[in-house]
Amino acid sequence: GSIIKPLTVAAGLDADAITPQSTYYDAGSIELDTFTIHNFDRRGRGTVSMQEVLNQSLNTGVAHIVDQMGKGTFRQYFLDLKLGSEAGIDLPNEVHGLIGNLDSPRDVEYATASFGQGIALTPIGAVRALATLGNGGHLITPHLVRAIQHEDGSTQPVLYPDGNQVFTAETSEAISRMLVNTVDDALRQGEVALPNYTVAAKTGTAQIADEVQGGYYEDRFLHSFCGYFPVYDAQFLIFLYTVEPQGARYASETLTDPFMELLTFLINYYDLPPDR
């Protein structure tokens, strides 16, 4: 779903294919390989910036970014983010993500992958990739153990190797600013923004694949929400998802409140200092 869009925007920024101020003309849909790709509401917005691509979650916008950077470059970023691999967490029976569509020469496969359709990720695989946006661009292998405390009271830190640099620190800072703007201005029209803390977040509303008939159900969705904070010294990343929620079409309706409740609890519990 659309939580992938920040990764596409970050790749475009990192490849110097776009800037946050870059614009494109949004007609509401594009034609690729005899397929039509629409925005979620099938409306065009005219000339819009990359910031508005995130604010309004425009499918045509991230497809435009792929076109600007080229399919090969886009594919390489997704490979560097290990989206088709296991995340490597120290738990049994982990499975890998599915991005085999990017082996296709068809433009439409890359366009749909840019907004999270036609690919599949595990929650921990998604978290691993999305964490690069807020940690300076490093792809870190997730682990459960930070230290071992012995019976004599001594503590032995468990050290892990640094992750690979996928995005530059400048790209990480730029996409984080954009996602803060999305929360401040667009997420529920800015009503959940916190006055003293920066929060970077993106929602996702993905159609569920119809494994019998092919294609996607029109009325069955997977909602997701990912955010990290405080952005300029990020301490926490929260990833939520729910399968086939009832009574709401979009993830902003179902998962914003749980996210903000968890965020508020963590700020209070760890007494995090304000960052704005």
Residue ranges of model-derived segments:
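Beta-lactam-recognizing serine transpeptidase/beta-lactamase-like catalytic domain environment
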Residues: 1-2, 7-242, 251, 272
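Short, gly/Ser/Thr-rich active-site loops of penicillin-recognizing serine hydrolases
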Residues: 154-157, 256-276
